[in-house]
Amino acid sequence: MTEFVVAIPARYAASRLPGKPLRLLGGEPLVLHVARRALQAGAGEVWVATDDQRIADALSGLAEVKVAMTATSHASGTDRLAECARIAGWADDTVVVNLQGDEPFAPAAGIRAVAQALVEGNAPMSTLATAVEDAETLFDPNVVKLVRNVRNEAMYFSRAPIAWHRDGFARSREVLPEGHAWLRHIGIYGYRAGFLQQFAAMPPGRLEQVESLEQLRVLEAGYPISVAISPEPFPAGIDTPEDLERAEALLQTLAAR
């Protein structure tokens, strides 16, 4: 199995769900669920990069998880993880998986898959995708879509429905046209620790600013991103109170099995 470490950015002041890492899911803080998922995936180290002591305190019961207290001024999770990597002292060739702090149902196989995609590909960065199941998801601007080339590398990420099915969508936008498969991006990333520092040092790109998608900075700078298909279902992360309610229902369903 590919050796890797997991870093989880956990900022307290989330705009759409303030205090998100500490919101309770099944009676426990959200960040605790995410950290356990990383441990279950077999990561050599699991770090949570945060800017708030309350989040660090919530993790005190997980001895295997380390906490990096990072600056409150970081503009993005990538910047926060770059500081975490420096604190951890990872060598430049260390495989780092960036697991978002709002992914309490991230499957262990998916976490391992993004690390494997990095090692097996020729790109300095990797990520995951899964199939879009319905038209509502495809047209939702909060759901990021992507297209990839024959080398399984990302060509573009967008909040818009890509590729645009000219004839099919002219007929209806209520159902997905037959004969084409769309991909939903899963916001988990893999990179070597050295490239993570490069990424954080790059200036924001024009497309990144238009779409508000940080990964576009890498494509605009001319670097490829390997895209693997998640080997297991990868439920969407938690961004809103409604998402948290759905997550609570899913947790209860899983517990009843």
Swiss-Prot record:
One of its GO terms (molecular function) is 3-deoxy-manno-octulosonate cytidylyltransferase activity. It catalyses: 3-deoxy-alpha-D-manno-oct-2-ulosonate + CTP = CMP-3-deoxy-beta-D-manno-octulosonate + diphosphate. GO terms for cellular component: cytosol. The keyword Hydrolase does not apply. Its main location: cytoplasm. It holds the Pfam family CTP_transf_3. GO terms for biological process: CMP-keto-3-deoxy-D-manno-octulosonic acid biosynthetic process; lipopolysaccharide biosynthetic process. Its EC number is 2.7.7.38. Pathway: Nucleotide-sugar biosynthesis; CMP-3-deoxy-D-manno-octulosonate biosynthesis; CMP-3-deoxy-D-manno-octulosonate from 3-deoxy-D-manno-octulosonate and CTP: step 1/1; Bacterial outer membrane biogenesis; lipopolysaccharide biosynthesis. It comes from the Bacteria. Activates KDO (a required 8-carbon sugar) for incorporation into bacterial lipopolysaccharide in Gram-negative bacteria. PANTHER family: 3-DEOXY-MANNO-OCTULOSONATE CYTIDYLYLTRANSFERASE, 3-DEOXY-MANNO-OCTULOSONATE CYTIDYLYLTRANSFERASE, MITOCHONDRIAL. Belongs to the KdsB family. This is 3-deoxy-manno-octulosonate cytidylyltransferase. It comes from Stenotrophomonas maltophilia (strain K279a).
